[in-house]
């Protein structure tokens, strides 16, 4: 480690990224971010640049992308390769999955509306048909 000012402990990385130490440790254990080593006290050390990667991971997770997709993208990015097309394809697949979920929720909403409409004249009877 050439310059100690470039390396930060896990707590500092977590704080700068706005996430818990547990989350940073998880991402590290899952191979999403590289660990530079450990202090004499056993704390994990990271390059300051990892904070940017943690923000990126957080954003991509927020879009619903799988950790495996994010891991592949970050590995390629670190090697200077562009996997934008692969990432865009994953995002298109996520869009399709969201579209299907929205359609299913709209169907459920319609079923709820129809069921409640059937109760308009139930008169508070316990024997009213529920479905």
Q: Where are the regions that the model predicts?
A:
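C-terminal regulatory/oligomerization modules of transcriptional regulators
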Residues: 1-4, 81-131
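Basic helix-turn-helix/winged-helix DNA-binding cores
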Residues: 1-75
């Amino acid at each position: 480690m050439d310059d100690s000012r470039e390396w930060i402990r896990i707590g500092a990385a977590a704080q700068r990224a706005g996430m818990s130490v547990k989350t940073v440790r998880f991402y590290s254990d899952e191979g999403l971010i590289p660990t530079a080593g450990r202090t004499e006290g056993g704390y994990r050390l990271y390059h300051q640049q990892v904070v940017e990667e943690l923000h990126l991971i957080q954003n991509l997770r927020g879009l619903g992308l799988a950790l495996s997709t994010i891991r592949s993208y970050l590995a390629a990015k670190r090697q200077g390769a562009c996997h934008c097309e692969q990432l865009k394809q994953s995002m298109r697949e996520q869009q399709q999955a969201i579209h299907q979920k929205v359609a299913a929720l709209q169907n459920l909403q319609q079923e709820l509306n129809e069921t409640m409409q059937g109760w308009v004249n139930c008169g508070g009877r316990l024997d009213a048909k529920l479905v």
